[in-house]
Amino acid sequence: MKPDRDSLDEFFEYEAEDFLVYLALLITEGRTPEHSVKGRTEGPHCPPAQLSQPAPNKHECSDKLAQCREARKTRSEVAFLWRNNIPIMVEVMLLPDCCYSDEGANTDGNDLNDPALKQDALLLERWTLEPVPRQSGDRFIEEKTLLLAVRSFVFFSQLSAWLSVSHGAVPRNILYRVSAADEELKLNFSHSPTEHVFPVPNVSHNVALKVSVQSLPRQSSYPVLNCSIHSNLGFYEKKILPREHSVTQPHNSQDNDQNSAPVSQHAFTKPSWSVGPEGLLHARTNVSTDLSLPVRNSKLLSTVDKGYSIGTPPSKHQCFSMTGNYKAAPQEPVRNFKSFSLVGVPCSPQASQTVETNPLIGSLIQERQEVIARIAQHLLQCDQTSSQINSHSIINELSSINGKIKNSSEDEKFQKKNKESPPICTSTLALTLSTGNQISNLKKAPDTPINSSRPILEFHTSPNPQARRKLILFESNEHFCNPFQSSGQSTVPSSNNENINKLPEKRDIKQSEHGEISTRTGNQLSNSCNTNDRLCTNTQIVPEDKSCTDSFHKPQKDNPKICSQKVGHRNGQAQETTCRETRKSDHSNQLLSIENCINKDRDNIQYKEPQDKLKSVHDENEDPTNCDCLAQGQRKCNGNCLQRSESLKNTEQKPIQLRHSCTWKKQTFRSLDGISTKAFHPRTGLPLLSSPVPQRKTQSGYFDLDNSLLKLKGLSTQRQHVNGFTDEDTVATNKQLSSSAPPAPCLSLLGNFEESVLNYRFEPLGVVEGFTAEVGASGIFCPTHMTLPVKVSFYSVSDDNAPSPYMGNITLESLGKRGYRIPPSGTIQVTLFNPNKTVVKMFVVKYDLRDMPANHQTFLRQRTFSVPVRRETKGAVTENGLKAEDRTLRYLIHLRFQSSKSGKIYLHRDVRLLFSRKSMEVDSGAAYELKSYIETPTNPQYSPRC
């Protein structure tokens, strides 16, 4: 009956539903791209490699994180399918980088109904998780073994190889889809896939799990994916030429080139935009565009009510049309538009003319109208880190493409209309781009999209205080004009550049890696709107009437105000300005207490220091020690702050003591760093820790104590009441003690050094930190290996302070109340590492506890001796015939076992070791070998648990 019980209870450490979720999350998050040498990492929701080991930093999900939302969605989908006994399918696919966003790794399953997405996606893997009836007979593998196999497959997959080679740059748009496996397949492999079937584990008493994966064959190079929009560019070139096609041609003059907007209300109510392979912004309409300058990091969101229509000619003015209220703040000079909204409103009625489209082209555009509008919401620009391209090559490539479109779309009738009625531009926004010295000065803008529907501009600032630069604040009820904007003018006034350059030297505005307005305007456009731009270092946006004090300059048109102090609210009534004074000594210890004092004295500081006293404005790059804000408040609390920091510092320096059965003296329980004389030999001065284990010439061979130890002056007085270890004294001691007597304040030493140390009867001379041990077991199942810290101590046991073996203690309390679960019979392996991560000893212990009753306990001790080799009598000498004085104890391991009520076997409480710090197998000059002996209690072998 016991094997049946083991087969039913032994291997199911996880619930079946949780195990399915682990597998799904490992597939979807096991290859999260990151910019590193490895190129990928496991997401925070992936199961750890060692589930039994406590995680150092446990992840807490937040609804604000997209990855957490996707993980929660995956959990719910997998749980729903599993509860309904439906096979689960996970598809891994790639999308082109040009027309799909790289922010979201997952998308709704409904989007796969889109014919354009079906055509654009490249299917890499198709995983199938199918519940099957429980396997009969011998078990195949455990759930954890399957988890490791899936992790290994994910690690060595084609997708991981691409990420590793590119250091996380490509692929960027990875799509995961969780669905029912019995649904109709919406995507097919481009080549015949290879299939791998994993071993089938049992996940419950009557259900097993079959996991299989179909993957695309390995490819030597990364495939270049083109979306359906860009791949049909040649189709338009071939079809437009033989057909009659009327399009409004922009009027070319010697001064500037102006491109009109799309004019077909029916076919272009939602214009399509595309980003080329080099990251260029194109208007995918049938008008001729002249784009010759890269626009980096462009994400375009398509809306119908509000937005922009954007074009970027090389060095001329470009007309824009927009509807509704607009608010945008470019975070660096040109080419870094992060988010704009597109509408299909033409520039002016005069420029709008009906277009006679070809029926074939018109039907194709009408069919893809909704598809293009949805894809346009996720348009993005290739990242600067992925490709660095030359502007001259971009100009040449675009000019050739635009030339083809112009030649194919022009006819005689079209040219006549251009001569008779030139287009009239009525836009209110003009941009000029300078390709000279500004290219090298541009830096990457933050990835925060700026939507025209947002009332307040949002910025993502770096956690590094030095990277927090000046932000642009504006009122939500007024228009915000950027430095690249002009009010209904096609030329740029030069007076605006002078206004910006007239800023004081102390208020110099610098660029940062998170994007900001450069004062080196040169040939750039400047702001011509009548708005008051305020540049501040705070991360809170405060209305203008509450953010500046009377001491600042009065508001003037086209005069930015610069404030380098943090502005905030308290109880919605008033603001406070705080500046923390940097101290050179004990800054880290006093920081917390100083902030607490400042928080307590906020009210006094606000009323005692009015706002009109803030007469000087500091630059954020100046030395913070020059800031004299809150000087009075800090003088008041500095005394208390120093006292509190000292008390806090003292509480953090409490020593950590080992847990044992007797109380050790604080005078003798010291760390290795605090030992002066006892760590070295008093006569020779040599280090005692590196000496070999002393050989005791005694009858027992168990590191017996010498009687001369009792006369030492260096030992503590608590050990002086113990007399010689004779049989008479031992009997007399046993007679004095009874089971009803209370325990002595300090327990006496036991019969030999081994027992005294293992039972914590010795006071340690010091402790050594940094030892670790890897604990594992094998048998009918293999539990997860664990790496645990080892508390190591050493002792003084001889008259010349010769070193003793080290005592190591591995606490299993972190694994739970029961301990470390092991098979009923098998092998336990404990690998000990020193602080240098070098193996000191590998203990391998065989055991058999299959006959151990439930709710019982026992122990096992393995001793390893160095035994001389006698070649002349090899094979004739038995273990019993070996004399005790011929062997020396080298290593020892003490294990404790207990059984639960259901009969499961656990290693519990701790594992105790005796060893030498150095890996000393045998002496080089002697013929010795190591032999191990295992001892267990015999009468009784098992005892009931308390």
Swiss-Prot record:
Cellular localization per UniProt: Nucleus
Q: Which Pfam families would you find in this protein's record?
A: Chromosome_seg (PF13889), DUF4210 (PF13915)
Composition bias of kind Polar residues appears in: 247-267, 484-500
Major localisation: nucleus
* Stretches the record annotates as Required for macropage invasion: 749-806
Region Transactivation domain 1 (TAD1): which residues?
24-32
Note down the stretches annotated as region Disordered.
Answer: 34-58, 246-271, 484-524, 547-567
Q: What InterPro entries would the database entry show? A: Atos-like_C (IPR033473), Atos-like_cons_dom (IPR025261), ATOS_Transcription_Regulators (IPR051506)
The UniProt regions of compositional bias labelled Basic and acidic residues, in chain numbering, are 34-43, 503-517, 547-560
Asked if Nucleus is a keyword of the record, the answer is: yes
The UniProt keywords, alphabetically, are: Nucleus
Q: Which GO terms describe its cellular component?
A: nucleus
Q: Which residues form a coiled coil?
A: none
Q: Name one GO biological process term.
A: gastrulation with mouth forming second
The yes or no answer to whether the keyword Nucleus is present is: yes
Query: Which residues lie within the region annotated Transactivation domain 2 (TAD2)?
Result: 833-841
Domain comment, in the record's words? The protein contains 2 transactivation domains (TAD). Each of these domains may be required for transcriptional activation of a subset of target genes.
Which family does the UniProt entry place this protein in?
Belongs to the ATOS family.
The protein's role, per its UniProt record: Transcription regulator that syncronizes transcriptional and translational programs to promote macrophage invasion of tissues.
Protein name as catalogued: Atos homolog protein A
Q: Which organism is it from?
A: Xenopus tropicalis (Western clawed frog)
